[in-house]
Amino acid sequence: MKLSFTRAGVYRNGHFVFKDDFFLIGNSVEVSADTDFSNPNIFVFPGFVDVHVHLREPGFSYKETVSAGTLAASAGGFCAVCTMPNLDPVPDCLENLKVQLDIIERDAAVKVVPFGAITVGEGGERLSDME
């Protein structure tokens, strides 16, 4: 099935056409389509980024998993998320961050950018090693 979006507001002006697993964007893209969504009130974007999410793995998977959270993000049009460091272990050193990165690599449905903790254990007393 081929879908066409014409007269739509597009991230970068023009037409947006989904054809054979490719997106064509341009001012004069002409492709026959099974369905044409022609409406100036439609806006088409390549994807959104959420810079504040709580994917609670490792440590709190009963609240949210990387798999469930990123699948939900994908369904909502998000192509990337940035996850907060309130985890166990807290990603305040490379060793702890690696635990999180391994889970992300295994389970994420979209790109995940993890934030490290600024202070050791998120305690607010000693800066973590940010080098």
Protein language model features and the residues they cover:
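Conserved protein kinase catalytic core
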Residues: 13, 56-58, 123
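Short, flexible, glycine/charge-rich loop motifs used to bind or transfer phosphoryl groups or to couple energy/partner
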Residues: 12, 38-39, 44, 102-103, ...
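N-terminal metal-binding scaffold of metallo-dependent hydrolase/deaminase domains
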Residues: 1-34
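Detector for Asparagine
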Residues: 4, 13, 27, 39-41, ...
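Generic alpha-helical propensity signal that fires on short helical segments
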Residues: 21-23, 28, 62, 67-71, ...
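A generic structural signal for short, solvent-exposed coil/turn residues
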Residues: 14-16, 47, 104-106
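Divalent-metal coordination cores built from histidine and acidic residues
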Residues: 72-131
